[in-house]
Curated annotation (Swiss-Prot):
Signal peptide: none annotated. This is opdI. It comes from the Eukaryota. The gene is opdI. Residues 56-101 are annotated as: Disordered. Residues 66-81, 91-101 have a biased composition (Polar residues).
Length: 101
């Protein structure tokens, strides 16, 4: 134990380690205790992981409303260009062709 004492003296360098009980994890002298720290960290990890998993899922839905699936024919193919307001300018009754192409 003599080597432990000398290394402890050089490690703490200036303050008495007997008064450093707040930094130890034993439950006797005001510390939280090792088991309590592990439980707390485990709970925090669980809740953070649960929140991250839920946010990566689909957006939250109203559980009282029935789930409606989108019919297959209502979905657009992914390779078509945007139709709608962009091409409506060429159908203007003035006769001008304002087509961007």
């Amino acid at each position: 134990m003599r080597g432990y004492r000398s290394s402890q003296r050089t490690f703490f360098r200036g303050f008495d380690p007997r008064h450093a009980y707040r930094f130890r994890g034993d439950g006797r002298h005001g510390g939280m205790g090792g088991a309590l720290k592990i439980v707390f960290l485990g709970m925090m990890t669980y809740f953070i992981a649960k929140k991250a998993f839920r946010s990566s899922q689909h957006p939250p839905t109203d559980f009282n409303a029935p789930v409606q699936s989108v019919p297959q024919r209502a979905q657009r193919p992914s390779d078509t260009r945007l139709q709608g307001p962009v091409l409506l300018a060429s159908n203007h009754p003035s006769g001008d062709s304002a087509s961007p192409e």
